[in-house]
């Protein structure tokens, strides 16, 4: 990096985006005969991009999403039944602005959680507030927060986010208090905030999760109103990977022969 009186000033102002690209932009300005205002605009754009990426990283960390499970990394060829055009439409996050829900059902390993996580990342990119947790963990955390006096704050994060992702709905049995908490969350967010739900259970089995027909009917009525239901079929990613690995090993030449 070149030595210039500007460098310590950029460091003092914490303009690391401009600092990191200053040499590159100075060289570009000379080669392309850029006007000073054009050169400065490029540096400002670099700083804005750096801050945008930092905000996204912070929101990812706070949201509970997994950075590596983005839509860009989703293997659509492995799940041919998925309507990619529909997923791309969801990725615009218009459904969040309309306070609509997305319900993803299907067997283990077909990409439900990956899709939900990928859509949540797209929401984060649009500066939307996201809270993502497996259902049983979210409810366990609420129970612990109630005991420690932090329940109002913990509940507020769930209720006030723009997009709530409830992963693995119905995977584990819930206590009566957890069921009540889940119902209240769904009820409070009705037409106020979007929810994405993933579940290994068929939609027809979702009533069983609540162990109370009245609560189940009320909760699912709110959850399914203004909702998009996607039933995903196919073979588990993990099973397919194990089969490919077994085939690959079987085709390897025997070194002892």
Language model segments and positions:
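Conserved P-loop
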Residues: 82-160, 207-209
